[in-house]
């Protein structure tokens, strides 16, 4: 794929991620870039979980990176925004509104990605409000099953902590939430991304890029991750902490 095509693809992906919340499948990618290639195997199904007060960069970075990975592998990658409450419009931390057309269906996902947001404003929409409400942490706890990887970034990790998912597990989060994560039983690691098999966590805000690039490398291979880094003009930061064995 040449540079002009890559830049055009990036623009299309950015628009899709921030305005429609729709899955960018292989057919859409081919239309956007003027290219097509045979696909094989089962698709990698990614659900990015949204809620009112979610941070804009947290929701956009993993979506765009994982959607763009479709161009660097012969495996389809299907990325969708979902909400626990079904089809609705969410309002992000800085006022961006997104219409989300997909409801909660973790049984149809291989990877759940949980962003953060609103952690500094305890009475505003965001992570604290979702913890008080209780429904999303319960749903995340119940979603766990063999074959599903749950990933979270920034203070989205605290939703997993409230669900009991991080208890006794290596993990990380935004630096302002690290003490509480440890108090609630998380085993803190000093790394930007922590991979403990079916649980992958990342630090604050921009760490969403590194989380997504790591997941691409893990699920789709090094070449896909390198291709994305070149397209995005961004190199993954830091050493990923990984457990000795992955479930």
Name each model-derived stretch:
Residues 2-150, 158-162, 178-182, 188-189, ...:
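Extended, subdomain-level signal for the structured scaffold at the beginning of enzyme domains
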Residues 129, 170, 202-205:
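Short capping loops/turns at secondary-structure boundaries
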Residues 150-151, 172, 189, 200:
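Structural detector of well-ordered beta-strand residues that form the stable sheet scaffold
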Residues 158, 175, 196:
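Positions that flank functional sites
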Residues 165-178:
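Short, glycine-/small-residue-rich phosphate/pyrophosphate-handling segment
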Residues 190-205, 233-234:
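Conserved Rossmann-fold dehydrogenase catalytic segment
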